[in-house]
C-alpha cells in the first residue's frame, strides 16, 4: 500500500494526550495546525489557496462525533495568507492504530501516549461515512455536536448498505450512498448558506420541481 505523506515525516509526532481529548490539548492543536497541516493541505485538490502564500493555519472550531468503533472530529480551519486574507476549510479527522490502517490517505504518523498510529481523513473510513448516513436518517438534533442533521421529505431509505466516492474531489468530496443518494461534503466553507443546498431544497420542498435531483437531507 502506498502511504500518502508517509515519506514526508520520517518519525511520528508524539503527544501525551489520547485521541478522545486531542482537540482539547494545546500542544496537539499547535503541532497539528503548523507542522502537520501546512505540509498536507497545500497538496490537496480542494485547497483553493495555491496561488497565494500561506502564512499560518488556525483551528477555529471543532466537533466530536462517535460511533461504536471510533471517535471522529470535524475541524474548521482558518487558513491565513500573507496577502492579508483568509479562507475557511472543513476537515474530518480520524486516528487509526497501526494494525487497523486500511487507507492510503495518511495525513501524518502520530503517537498518542503509548499508542502509535496515523492521523487520516475520516471520509476515507467507511465507519465514518455510515455514521453520517445514520445520523441523517435519524435526524436528531444534538446541541453538543454543534450540528443539525436534517432528513428531507423525499428521503425514504432507512438502512445503510454501501458508500463510495464519486470521481475526483475538487472543492468538495461527493459520496454515493446505496447507489442512490449523493452527499456533497464541501471542503471550503463560507459564512453564508451554500447556494447548492438552498436551491436544491427550495426546488424539492417548495416548488416540487421534478426535473432536478431531489433534496433528501443535509448536515
Tell where the protein language model's regions lie, with residue ranges.
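Conserved ATP-binding subdomain of kinase catalytic cores across diverse folds
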Residues: 61-219
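C-terminal low-complexity, glycine/proline- and small-hydrophobic-enriched intrinsically disordered tails
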Residues: 1, 49-66
Amino acid at each position: 500500500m502506498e502511504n500518502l505523506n508517509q515519506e514526508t515525516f520520517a518519525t511520528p509526532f508524539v503527544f501525551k494526550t489520547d485521541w478522545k481529548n486531542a482537540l482539547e490539548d494545546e500542544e496537539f492543536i499547535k503541532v497539528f495546525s503548523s507542522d502537520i497541516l501546512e505540509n498536507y493541505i497545500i497538496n490537496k485538490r480542494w485547497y483553493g489557496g495555491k496561488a497565494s502564500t500561506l502564512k499560518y493555519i488556525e483551528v477555529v472550531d471543532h466537533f466530536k462525533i462517535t460511533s461504536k468503533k471510533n471517535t471522529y472530529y470535524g475541524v474548521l480551519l482558518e487558513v491565513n495568507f500573507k496577502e492579508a486574507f483568509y479562507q475557511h476549510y472543513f476537515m474530518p479527522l480520524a486516528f487509526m492504530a497501526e494494525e487497523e490502517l486500511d487507507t492510503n490517505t495518511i495525513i501524518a504518523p502520530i503517537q498518542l501516549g503509548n499508542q502509535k498510529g496515523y492521523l487520516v481523513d475520516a471520509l476515507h473510513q467507511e465507519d465514518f461515512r455510515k455514521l453520517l448516513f445514520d445520523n441523517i436518517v435519524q435526524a436528531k438534533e444534538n446541541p453538543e455536536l454543534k450540528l443539525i442533521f436534517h432528513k428531507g421529505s423525499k428521503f425514504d431509505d432507512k438502512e445503510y448498505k454501501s458508500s463510495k466516492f464519486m470521481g475526483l474531489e475538487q472543492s468538495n468530496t461527493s459520496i454515493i450512498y446505496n447507489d442512490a443518494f449523493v452527499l456533497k461534503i464541501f471542503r471550503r466553507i463560507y459564512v453564508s448558506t451554500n447556494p447548492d443546498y438552498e436551491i436544491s431544497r427550495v426546488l424539492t420542498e417548495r416548488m416540487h420541481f421534478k426535473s432536478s435531483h431531489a433534496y433528501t437531507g443535509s448536515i
